[in-house]
Amino acid sequence: MNHHHLSLTYPDELIGADAYILDKVPSLDVARRFMETQARYESTANLHGVSAQSNPSGGNFYRGLYNIAIKSLGAAMKKSEETVLEGILEYSERLNNRKGYWFMDTPGNDIESVTGQVAAGCTIVMFSTGNGSITNHPFVPISFPL
């Protein structure tokens, strides 16, 4: 049995890059669900007195990522222009026989997002960061930063 799927996580990593992500979606429902993840993240941030636009860290600023849109475009570019966003997965929702490119609504934290992907059935995790933070997971045979 050979299943090929890829998932991207972190709603907060894509604030401001939604047009690029939604350029190729199979339905209005997928686009709507993706935008709901963004709105929920922004609403939660606002409840805590924080703006989703203020997400970049000190390390991001140091490396020239001065606003969330610039940072988000870097995350979004992990998807090629031709790649279709097949759908939205809830945190740790099983991928099962689904193929293609999926977005998982995870917390904006390295270890929590990787745990959700592993619980969904991912067996290889390639995690790229600008600051070189390294995360690993005991249930994934290969987990490395790019």
Predicted regions located by residue number:
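Anaerobic metallocofactor- and corrinoid-dependent redox/one-carbon enzyme cores
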Residues: 1-5, 9-146
